Amino acid sequence: MQQIEVKRLLVNYKTLEEFRNFREFGAAELSMKDDLEANIIENDSESPFYGIYFGGKLVARMSLYRIDGKYDRYFEPPQDYLELWKLEVLEPYRGKGFGRALVDFAKSFNLPVKTNARQRSNEFWTKMGFEPVTYQTDRDRGESPYVWYPEGVKEQLSEDEGSVETLEN
């Protein structure tokens, strides 16, 4: 297979139009159209959206947000980390390495990566080297959190309960 290149997507109306394909053919739960529209309105030039084009068509995409370490009570040692949201590959392009390429791109920053398994994707995240973590309502925005830990990083435990500390957003 040819080299897969992950690109930062521009926050503009062309990208919005490309996202409509995902809304039409993808899972409604994974729609990023509203997220992109909010970034256009806010004139946010630092796009959190990344994607892969195949044959001139956007076929895979995700949101990737860097969270400042000063807000981290999740990892030991506390540090910056990434939140990966709404990874989606259009149905005809699944099983071709596009999802793995997006995940590998996120891992290339060598920071912990948090995500939430949606659309029965638990097996995919496990295959990508992510570990399921216990869901906590005051910390996690989704009920099926998964984390990838780079070498030397582990989950931070509270001293009194032995449970995971919360992350306030």
Swiss-Prot record:
Q: Which GO terms describe its molecular function?
A: acyltransferase activity, transferring groups other than amino-acyl groups
Provide the top EC class.
Answer: transferase
Q: Give yes or no: UniProt keyword Acyltransferase.
A: yes
Name the coiled-coil region(s).
Answer: none
- Span of domain N-acetyltransferase: 4-160
- Which EC number(s) are documented for this chain? 2.3.1.-
User: Can you name this protein?
Assistant: Uncharacterized N-acetyltransferase BH2580
User: Which organism's genome codes for this protein?
Assistant: Halalkalibacterium halodurans (strain ATCC BAA-125 / DSM 18197 / FERM 7344 / JCM 9153 / C-125) (Bacillus halodurans)
